[in-house]
């Protein structure tokens, strides 16, 4: 194969002085050398750096900081002792007000460069940030891979740009109680000589330790993901590989009185999927209960008293309980505006998870249909409807790709569609269904500015004959649910044109 001719003379190993001009989606700082963008991990805008290039391509290069010549005014002291090696956070070295501003900028950049929309095309409102105490210890869920290395049980996060595991003993974005429970888990695996999973050989038992904590009462749920076929409890005690986990579970609950339950999740498959489809409760119950409460006087009394949510180990729920309320308030405001002329509004909530958005909107509307494919999340959602005495929410188990067209063409047509897809965004099937059958208004909740911008562009495209069957984004509100990282949520209200 012929070598690609480079339009520059940069070489791997070369050391350059670079001034960081911006931050990219992914967290890297970006500076330019002869017009070529250079991506630099752990950089801040305004840094003057000595950078060693380790990856040089035709259109970009990557470099590592050799020295900080002049630090940016945005730099801050990272609160976590693992930050320099851990891949969990990207922006702890940047002060929080600057983090929030850059996240808003990432949304603008994506809309402009991918979605083709400038400031004159859509209103991008100031970000709803977590300033005032919500910048640290906010995570209500964490998933820790487990390895056995040099006689030591490791559980934590993968290192920066690697598959090596960092044994996290203190994490500044999760509650201290999680640190304590994780440490006990490591000790118990060692005590009972439980084999950690070896991904390369597909051998060993414990793959992950997952922890979920309620911010309402501090209770925790611990889940051990094991490399084993699903077992019923009747056969469980005859299996020597698994019965040891019952001892681990009992000791864990004895050591931490705030643990509500210990669950075994079975995942015998190769690959990087974390959870399997089947679980077994070893001790206690299979869920914790969260309460989301608004302080706004203009919200319904039920939401001021608090929306109760049952969360099992595998159910999707926002990882930041406090900022989830801010996001839900924004969704409700947009929904009220969109439905102002509807006498008995009907809402479809796609990718509903445990029903957080559906249940939050239920006091404002006549009825909500929540679509979710995860059976455990649907079970939690139905339980949450009963828990909150909400009788106008129906849960439909199934893939959004298959259920959405049917729901929007049969029976009572929805007045509003809410979509909250995973990071990969909306599939072509869902985009087509929305354009063909969707209601006048759509609210799009996104956790990825890149796929959001792509989908907004696709939803705004006119038909092959130029017919107007698309949607225009009217307002976008970024929300920070992930301080110390580059991740940012956005809530968008779209209207048919």
List where the protein language model places each region.
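Terminal RNA-binding accessory module
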Residues: 1-82, 394, 402
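Rossmann-like S-adenosyl-L-methionine
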Residues: 3-17, 228-497
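Short, acidic/hydrophobic/Gly-rich beta-strand patch recurrent on exposed beta strands
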Residues: 29-34, 156-159, 223-225, 381
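Short, conserved phosphate/pyrophosphate- and ester-handling motifs at nucleotide-, phospho-/glycolipid
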Residues: 46, 174, 320
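Extended interfacial segments that mediate partner engagement and assembly in macromolecular machines
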Residues: 66-78, 84-196, 215-217, 231
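Short, solvent-exposed loop/turn elements at beta->coil junctions and helix N-caps
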Residues: 124-134, 199-200, 207-212, 477-481
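Internal alpha/beta scaffold segment
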Residues: 165-207, 228-232, 236-263
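Carbohydrate-binding surface patches
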Residues: 210-214, 219-232
């Amino acid at each position: 194969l012929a070598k690609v001719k480079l339009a520059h003379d940069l070489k791997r190993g070369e050391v350059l002085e670079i001034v960081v001009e911006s931050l990219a989606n992914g967290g890297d700082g970006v500076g330019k050398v002869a017009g070529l963008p250079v991506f630099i991990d752990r950089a801040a805008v305004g840094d003057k750096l000595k950078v060693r290039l380790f990856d040089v391509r035709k259109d970009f290069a990557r470099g590592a900081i050799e020295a900080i010549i002049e630090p940016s005014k945005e730099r801050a002291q990272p609160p976590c002792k693992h930050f320099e090696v851990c891949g969990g956070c990207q922006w702890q070295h940047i002060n929080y007000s600057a983090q929030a501003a850059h996240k808003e900028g990432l949304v603008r950049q994506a809309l402009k460069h991918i979605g083709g929309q400038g400031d004159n095309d859509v209103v991008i409102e100031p970000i709803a940030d977590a300033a005032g105490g919500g910048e640290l210890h906010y995570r209500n869920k964490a998933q820790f891979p487990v390895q056995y290395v040099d006689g030591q049980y490791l559980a934590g996060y993968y290192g920066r740009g690697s598959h090596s595991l960092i044994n996290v003993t203190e994490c500044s974005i999760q509650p201290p109680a999680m640190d304590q429970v994780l440490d006990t888990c490591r000790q118990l695996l060692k005590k009972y000589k439980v084999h950690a999973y070896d991904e390369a050989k597909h051998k060993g038992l414990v793959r992950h330790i997952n922890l979920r904590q309620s911010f309402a009462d501090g209770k925790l749920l611990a889940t051990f993901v094991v490399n084993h076929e699903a077992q019923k409890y009747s056969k469980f005690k005859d299996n020597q590989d698994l019965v040891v986990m019952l001892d681990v579970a009992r000791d864990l609950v004895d050591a931490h009185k705030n643990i509500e339950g210990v669950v075994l999740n079975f995942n015998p498959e190769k690959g990087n999927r974390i959870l399997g489809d089947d679980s077994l409760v070893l001790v206690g119950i299979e869920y914790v209960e969260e309460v989301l409460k608004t302080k706004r006087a203009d919200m319904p009394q039920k939401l001021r008293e608090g929306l109760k949510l049952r969360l099992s180990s595998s159910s999707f729920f926002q990882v930041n309980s406090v900022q989830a309320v801010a996001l839900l308030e924004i969704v409700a405001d947009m929904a009220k505006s969109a439905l102002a002329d509807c006498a008995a509004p009907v809402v479809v909530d796609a990718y509903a998870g445990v029903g957080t958005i559906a249940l939050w909107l239920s006091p404002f509307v006549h009825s909500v249909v929540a679509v979710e494919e995860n059976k455990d999340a649907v079970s939690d959602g139905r339980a949450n409807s009963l828990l909150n005495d909400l009788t106008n929410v129906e849960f439909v188990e199934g893939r959004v790709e298959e259920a959405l067209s049917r729901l929007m063409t049969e029976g009572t047509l929805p007045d509003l569609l809410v979509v909250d897809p995973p990071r990969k965004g909306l599939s072509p099937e869902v985009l087509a269904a929305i354009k063909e059958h969707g209601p006048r208004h759509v609210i799009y909740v996104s956790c990825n500015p890149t796929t959001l911008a792509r989908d907004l562009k696709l939803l705004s495209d006119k038909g092959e004959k130029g017919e107007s069957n698309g949607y225009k984004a009217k307002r976008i509100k970024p929300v920070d649910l992930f301080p110390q990282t580059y991740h940012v949520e956005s809530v968008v209200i779209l209207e048919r044109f």
